[in-house]
Amino acid sequence: MAEISHPPMEQLQDLEYCIDSNPPWPETVLLAFQNYILMLGTSAFIPALLVPAMGGSDGDRARVIQTLLFVAGIKTLLQALFGTRLPAVVGGSLAYVVPIAYIINDSSLQKISNDHERFIHTMRAIQGALIVASSIQIILGYSQVWGLFSRFFSPLGMAPVVGLVGLGMFQRGFPQLGNCIEIGLPMLLLVIGLTQYLKHVRPFKDVPIFERFPILICVTIVWIYAVILTASGAYRGKPSLTQHSCRTDKANLISTAPWFKFPYPLQWGPPTFSVGHSFAMMSAVLVSMVESTGAYIAASRLAIATPPPAYVLSRGIGWQGIGVLLDGLFGTGTGSTVLVENVGLLGLTRVGSRRVVQVSAGFMIVFSTLGKFGAVFASIPVPIYAALHCILFGLVAAVGLSFLQFTNMNSMRNLMITGLSLFLGISIPQFFAQYWDARHYGLVHTNAGWFNAFLNTLFMSPATVGLIIAVFMDNTMEVERSKKDRGMPWWVKFRTFRGDNRNEEFYTLPFNLNRFFPPT
């Protein structure tokens, strides 16, 4: 048995740069730009999904993308400096789609005949709902309530939650890749080939460029290939879905984007407030808290840091609430969460440096003001990003499951909790999503639209369903007798900021701010 024994390891050993170590500046800049290119996929996808339904034009969509990128840069910088201080990119969230769809379909907005006017009024309604709903994260974060709740977490409970943060994104993987298999599949194979089979090839000095910059290299190659296919007329006469997924000549997005535009608060006009809209939006805020918590825990492991203590998690959620407030003030059209794909990129490149993400935030802010520049990159076909998602989401899921090494997986109790939370965490949201797709309304369908949006949003989130099941069962089944089996002897020292000496190294605030905001 000794030959097959792999003792649990608190920190991953295969990473080259941890949270506090930094690559050389030229490498840092390229890695930061790679993070920017990756987060563009979600930043362009959400407005493409929502803006037309709101009545917006291509010009409106370009402006929303700019605003989303600009605010994402600010949120990422704030989170990396004053929040969890983990190398996590904060961007637009798809968890907000259901409550936003409820607002879009509000009868008072639907009766506006002019499309542009309807877009403006809908955007203002979304802004008002985000501003009110942001108070949930701000209060739960800065009051340390979320930190108190996190004391119920254990390695056994967090393994399926973090796993579902990755696995729950499966619809953005091969289903989107398959819409243009001739672009998506080569991208998938190329990334796997370069990062796994050619990672030791170093044509330039000692930098493993294929492992360090796979997105820059692969996106460039496959994008050029896609341009050639489009120019050669390969998609002429093809179904509209194929053309939309494969073609690169999205001239409207580029032509309607301004050369220079500086997003500013209340640029769409004063927000409007509705009790129903705000309650509906609160569900998405709760979901994004759960998903971000799982993403933070995954990011900490991929950055060779300790699991974030309760105080740090609460601090991060509080700053994320500030981010949602900024979304409402600027009008990004959606709320925010930690982008799971960028967390996966830490593992793919083996670089967990905080500085890389901070520089990436600078790219987001600067390039968001240069409309045409950002629009060019935003026109990268979705299947290219879907291929990356297959790898990166899967990697985050595996990081989550790696927490099971600290538990006793020969225990039927632990097997039951892990299996049930993983299975139902995928099965329940999929059932809700299929119901929505078939009928264009959720499984919960009463006369109270805000109530429908609230519950449907909660149960369409794999990580949230997984958290409810895993944490409840883990804290109600043979708790005292199973402390060691649950992994608590290892986990308990990370509950408090001073429980492990390394926490101070990883999570202390800059500029000596801990004097004014001491850990609780």
From Swiss-Prot:
Entry GO terms, CC: membrane; plasmodesma
InterPro entries referenced in this protein's UniProt entry, alphabetically: NCS2
Tissue specificity comment: Expressed in cotyledons 4 days after imbibition (DAI). Expressed in the minor and major veins of cotyledons and leaves, in the shoot apex and pedicels. Expressed in the root meristems, root tips and lateral root primordia.
GO MF annotations in UniProt: transmembrane transporter activity
Keyword list, A-Z: Membrane, Transmembrane, Transmembrane helix, Transport
Membrane topology type: Multi-pass membrane protein
Subcellular location per the Swiss-Prot or TrEMBL entry: Membrane
A Pfam family that the UniProt record links to this protein: Xan_ur_permease
Chief location category: membrane
Transmembrane segments: 36-56, 64-84, 86-106, 129-149, 150-170, 174-194, 213-233, 279-299, 362-382, 384-404, 415-435, 453-473
NCBIfam families for the chain: NCS2_1
Family: Belongs to the nucleobase:cation symporter-2 (NCS2) (TC 2.A.40) family.
Protein known as: Nucleobase-ascorbate transporter 1
